[in-house]
């Protein structure tokens, strides 16, 4: 069905407009564009757009993001990190405010705080790095995707990810969606192809203005940062006022 739709799909319109992202694309955005800049080793190295922003409002009021290695069945779950620290859920953003970085013993000492269980190594031959586990944006107060789309006159619904690029220092990103549809007068209409979403992480976080209630982890995956570790990401269906 996807292949057949793409055969007749139209090219996506250019410009800034409302965007509705499914939980797969939402998860990729949260992992890549937000999760990596929250890694304290990147912050300490000056390679994070979130450097110096702890305690500051960086997203809309409805944005709460957690990294939780204790999620039962989560692909990125682990009870104790690779430096022997018990893990716990970390609230990276709480109601739009940046509240915590991911860290390990070295970066915790650098910032004068307690380690929070973010040390992970690919195997015993590698040195532990600050890594994510199961990272997701929490649900909101909309029941269905129809609720998110009903007041959109013209926008795009994008699903999945075919990869992309992120600059953690500048806070910029670009992702290519697997599938997409035009939204017209609150309804899905024309299938689209070659949909690419780009922008600034902090700007997009401020523009999140709708989330469904049903936040879930999406498909499991692996994250590479010189080493490969299993991770989970996801969230609800997310609406962005302008992207």
What are the language-model segments listed below?
Residues 1-243:
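N-terminal small-residue-enriched
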């Amino acid at each position: 069905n996807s292949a057949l739709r793409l055969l007749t799909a139209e090219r996506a319109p250019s410009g800034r407009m409302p965007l509705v992202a499914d939980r797969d694309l939402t998860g990729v955005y949260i992992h890549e564009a937000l999760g990596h800049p929250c890694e304290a080793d990147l912050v300490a190295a000056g390679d994070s757009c979130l450097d110096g922003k702890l305690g500051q409002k960086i997203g809309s009021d409805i944005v709460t993001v957690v990294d939780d290695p204790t999620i039962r069945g989560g692909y990125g779950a682990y009870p104790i990190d690779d430096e022997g620290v018990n893990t716990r859920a970390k609230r990276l953003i709480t109601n739009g405010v940046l509240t915590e970085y991911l860290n390990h013993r070295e970066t915790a000492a650098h910032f004068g705080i307690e380690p929070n269980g973010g040390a992970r190594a690919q195997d015993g031959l590698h040195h532990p790095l600050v890594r994510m586990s199961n990272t997701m944006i929490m649900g909101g107060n909309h029941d269905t995707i129809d609720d998110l789309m009903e007041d959109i006159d013209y926008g795009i619904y994008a699903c999945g990810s075919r990869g992309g690029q992120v600059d953690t220092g500048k806070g910029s990103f670009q992702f290519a969606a697997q599938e997409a549809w035009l939204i017209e007068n609150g309804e899905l209409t024309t299938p689209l192809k070659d949909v690419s979403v780009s922008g600034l992480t902090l700007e997009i976080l401020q523009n999140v203005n709708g989330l469904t209630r049903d936040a879930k982890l999406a498909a499991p995956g692996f994250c590479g940062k010189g080493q490969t570790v299993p991770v989970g990401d996801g969230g609800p269906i997310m609406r962005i006022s302008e992207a």
